[in-house]
From Swiss-Prot:
Participates in a pentose oxidation pathway that converts D-arabinonate to 2-oxoglutarate. Keywords: Calcium, Carbohydrate metabolism, Lyase, Magnesium, Metal-binding. Induction: Expression is strongly increased by growth on D-arabinose, both at the mRNA and at the protein level. The gene is kdaD. Substrate binds at I86, K187, T261. SUPFAM superfamilies: FAH. Belongs to the FAH family. This is 2-dehydro-3-deoxy-D-arabinonate dehydratase. Homotetramer. The lineage of its organism: Archaea, Thermoproteota, Thermoprotei, Sulfolobales, Sulfolobaceae. Mg(2+) binds at E148, E150, D169. Its cofactor is Mg(2+); Ca(2+).
Amino acid sequence: MHFIMMKLFRVVKRGYYISYAILDNSTIIRLDEDPIKALMRYSENKEVLGDRVTGIDYQSLLKSFQINDIRITKPIDPPEVWGSGISYEMARERYSEENVAKILGKTIYEKVYDAVRPEIFFKATPNRCVGHGEAIAVRSDSEWTLPEPELAVVLDSNGKILGYTIMDDVSARDLEAENPLYLPQSKIYAGCCAFGPVIVTSDEIKNPYSLDITLKIVREGRVFFEGSVNTNKMRRKIEEQIQYLIRDNPIPDGTILTTGTAIVPGRDKGLKDEDIVEITISNIGTLITPVKKRRKIT
């Protein structure tokens, strides 16, 4: 079957993963193949393998996360997740407010913002990622962890964009501010990365540099923090980030690259147990995740 425009989502039913595609914003197909392969097939010839189904209430799943024995989850298992940082002017300014390392009088964030080479870092593996309605985590040894709402791209092994999604690059900012060499510990741990609820194909995003991104932190039923930005403020363009990611660095099909944040809540807005994080990106949707503080190991 040939269509234009596709949204891909996945559910768990009685322990089994089932992938679906919403085609032309109306028809729902149960996919006959791995969702990463389905994205690649669609990218090549707009073909989708699967059967039309009814009875899947996608909008209700988004609201309640689970209906009977069906629960929405992350749309794919990305073999690798990579991040790019300080790609917006606002991030450079906010990160540089902290007492962090300097090089020749400039903070490391100011230096990388002005440098030719962007910041690219390894972020997560599938077991460290969660999806819509699943809990992101605050490290047991962090007292200042922030959500980082970002537009992310799903890539094939050549760096071609297969689709777009919403990502939360959860970061233990106190660890990173203490010492830049602690960045991997700040960025990589169980529950450090959320994405979804869907992956939308490139034909649904006519211009990735005109998307509104909104972050809300809800605490005890009230909006505790809210911020927004448009991707037209992105200085490090996605194509440049991809080129540096794949330079001398082979990536597998289905790799996700998240493209940086411009919304950086202050030190007094750190996440707490039972907070709710909501990230909305126009033309994609809203990713909602509860927050859980990991227990210290004694």
